[in-house]
Amino acid sequence: MDYEMMKKSILAFLLLTSSAAALAAPQVITVSRFEVGKDKWAFNREEVMLTCRPGNALYVINPSTLVQYPLNDIAQKEVASGKTKAQPISVIQIDDPNNPGEKMSLAPFIERAEKLC
């Protein structure tokens, strides 16, 4: 194998491995109360980050503290088993003003986070 061919092979290998690593990295998006709408906003802060981890574990992340909160059962199980450190979602989830005693729905956020998987 000549030098030029070897250089091309190494470059191709590096591109393949770096793109595979990029595909495996969890996706993260930021959503704001303004973007989602005040009537659907479920959190006690103006914006949060959403992420999907391997295995479809969905989390909300507080952008100022980087504390994470499980958004679905898969994420809850990861926290319960000690695989991931997180706080309960109820810490940042607000009450539903139209339904006393109930919290705002997490469905719009679960839907958005699932698109990252």
Protein language model features and the residues they cover:
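N-terminal Sec signal peptide cleavage junction
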Residues: 19-23
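Contiguous interface-forming segments/domains that mediate binding rather than catalysis
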Residues: 26-27, 44, 52, 74-79, ...
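Flexible, solvent-exposed short loops/turns enriched in glycine
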Residues: 59-93
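N-terminal secretory signal peptides
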Residues: 25-66
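Sec-dependent N-terminal signal peptides
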Residues: 9-18
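Positively charged n-region of N-terminal signal peptides that target proteins for export
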Residues: 1-9
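C-terminal partner/receptor-binding element of secreted or periplasmic proteins
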Residues: 82-117
